[in-house]
Amino acid sequence: STVASLQRAGPGALSFLANPKYRRHLKTTRASAVVLSGRDARDSPVPVLLSDNPYACYARAARLLYPQETSRCGIHPSAVVDNTAEVDPGAWIGAHAVIEQHAKIGPSVQIGPGCVVGAGVEIGEGSQLVARVTVLAKAHIGRHTTLHPGVVIGSDGFGQAEVEGHWEKVPQLGSVVIGDDVEIGANTTVDRGSIENTVIEQGVKIDNQVQVAHNVFIGAQTAIAACVGISG
């Protein structure tokens, strides 16, 4: 009925072994069952579930045991939604969220508290802006994409032209295009393109506090760990 690490699991818990450095905990685990590969099965004192990819198998089991909350629909009384915005009836707009003119919010989208969806932004079906997320510059967010708290999409890239000893701002005219099934961690920023768009393709996973500068192209299924900076 629960999932737990090898060393902390007790009766009723499912655990897993995917990293050899934790193998020492296998012989003393009290889990009811362990997901592991065939090479480790003989060392387990408890029933095993064999898998070529124990970590992925554990992840799927955890999703079944801890399902996400059912999506809500409607608009919180404190939200501000421009009358030209298109909000699907099956979407949820949370407390103090702002949806600006001509934005398009698709079916089952969840917009959390304090989010800002700028003018002309499009957010695809089933995507989630968790809390205090800002999406600007007519950005396009695909389907089933998650933006964690504090993410900023579409802020200006760093464009400055040196003119006779001072700096002049270079207008940032592009946007941001984010594909389906993308996950972007807390306080990550993705700048709009200077002329062409900044692009994050399908299935990309980005950790917390990453900076993606203007005109960056991130290919499908890329994974990026925390605190990385990617120059434009």
Model-predicted segments: where are they?
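Terminal amphipathic alpha-helical/low-complexity segments used for targeting or macromolecular assembly
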Residues: S1-S78, G126, A139, H144, ...
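Structural signal for interior beta-strand "rungs" in well-ordered beta-sheet cores
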Residues: F16, G74-G232
